[in-house]
C-alpha cells in the first residue's frame, strides 16, 4: 500500500503487513511481481502502466467517465468489482441513497449559477464539467458558468476580475495544495476571499463553499466511499 492522505485508507497505509506497491501515479513493478497477484486493479493515474502490469497478472482498469457521469461511473466500477467476486447483489444497496441525496441538492441548485474552482500554487483555476468536481455541474444540477470549457486536468487559470464579471450565485472551491499537502502553501480562503471576490453575490450571501475533503475530491473520485464524502461536503456546505 502506498502512503495516503485519505482518512479511510490510513489503516491500510499504516499496516506493516501490507506491501507498499508504489504511488497512485507509478507502480513499483518489482513489488507487485513479488506479491504474485491473481488480478490487479488500477485507476486512471496508472493507465500508462497498464501494459507493464498486464505482464504480471490480468488488469482491471477502473476510471470515471464524465460522459457517463460520476455517479454512473461509480456504479459501473462497483458492479465490475462485484462481478469478479460474486457480490453483485451488494451494489444496489451500497448505491441506494445517492439518488435521493442528489435530488435534495437539486432543490437548492435549481436555477442557480456557479463557478467551480481549484486553488493551486496561489492561483485560482476554473473547472468545467469534463473533469474534477464535475459532480457539481452535472449530477448536482448547478449551472456551471464554465461548463463549456475544456478543463479536464487542472482547469484554466482565471483572473478574479472574471469571477466578478460572471458573478455566480455560488462559488465552489477545491484546495489542491491542501489535498496534496503542499508545504507552505496559502490556504484556499486566503486566495479566494480578496477584495474583488468580496463584491460578488456569492460572497455577500455566504455562498462560497470550500470542499472540506479536498483530498478525496482530488485523488479518490470514483469510489463509493469517496462519493458519499463528496455528497456530504455539498450537503454541509449548502445548509
Model features per residue range: what roles?
Residues 36-42, 58, 163, 167-172:
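Proline-aspartate-enriched helix->loop->beta-strand connector
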Residues 135, 153-180:
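Ligand-binding pocket segment of bilobal, Venus flytrap-like solute-binding proteins
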Residues 72, 83, 92, 170-239:
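Structured C-terminal subdomain patch of bacterial secreted/periplasmic proteins
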Residues 29, 33, 47-50, 54, ...:
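Extracytoplasmic/secreted envelope proteins and their assembly/folding machinery
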Residues 3-4, 48, 62-80, 113-135, ...:
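Extracytoplasmic ligand-binding site segments that recognize negatively charged/polar headgroups
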Residues 90-141:
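Basic- and aromatic-lined ligand-binding clefts that recognize polyanionic substrates
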Residues 1-34:
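A short, structured surface patch at a secondary-structure boundary
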Residues 7-14, 128-149:
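Ligand-binding cleft/hinge of the Venus flytrap
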Amino acid at each position: 500500500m502506498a502512503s495516503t492522505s485519505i482518512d479511510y485508507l490510513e489503516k491500510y497505509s499504516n499496516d506493516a503487513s501490507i506491501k507498499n506497491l508504489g504511488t497512485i501515479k507509478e507502480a513499483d513493478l518489482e513489488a507487485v511481481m513479488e506479491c504474485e497477484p491473481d488480478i490487479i486493479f488500477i485507476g486512471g493515474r496508472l493507465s500508462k502502466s497498464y501494459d507493464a502490469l498486464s505482464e504480471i497478472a490480468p488488469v482491471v482498469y477502473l476510471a470515471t467517465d464524465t460522459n457517463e457521469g460520476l455517479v454512473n461511473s461509480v456504479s459501473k466500477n462497483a458492479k465490475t468489482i462485484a462481478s469478479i467476486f460474486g457480490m453483485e447483489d451488494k451494489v444496489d444497496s451500497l448505491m441506494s441513497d445517492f439518488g435521493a441525496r442528489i435530488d435534495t441538492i437539486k432543490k437548492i441548485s435549481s436555477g442557480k449559477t456557479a463557478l467551480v474552482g481549484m486553488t493551486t500554487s496561489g492561483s485560482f483555476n476554473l473547472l468545467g464539467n469534463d473533469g474534477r468536481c464535475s459532480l457539481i455541474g452535472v449530477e448536482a444540477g448547478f449551472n456551471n458558468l464554465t461548463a463549456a470549457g475544456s478543463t479536464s486536468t487542472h482547469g484554466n487559470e482565471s483572473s478574479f476580475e472574471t469571477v466578478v464579471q460572471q458573478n455566480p450565485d455560488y462559488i465552489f472551491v477545491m484546495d489542491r495544495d491542501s489535498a496534496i499537502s503542499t508545504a507552505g502553501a496559502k490556504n484556499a480562503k486566503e486566495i479566494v476571499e480578496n477584495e474583488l471576490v468580496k463584491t460578488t453575490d456569492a460572497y455577500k450571501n455566504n455562498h462560497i463553499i470550500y470542499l472540506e475533503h479536498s483530498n478525496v475530491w482530488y485523488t479518490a473520485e470514483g469510489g463509493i466511499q469517496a462519493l458519499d464524502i463528496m455528497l456530504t461536503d455539498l450537503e454541509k456546505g449548502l445548509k
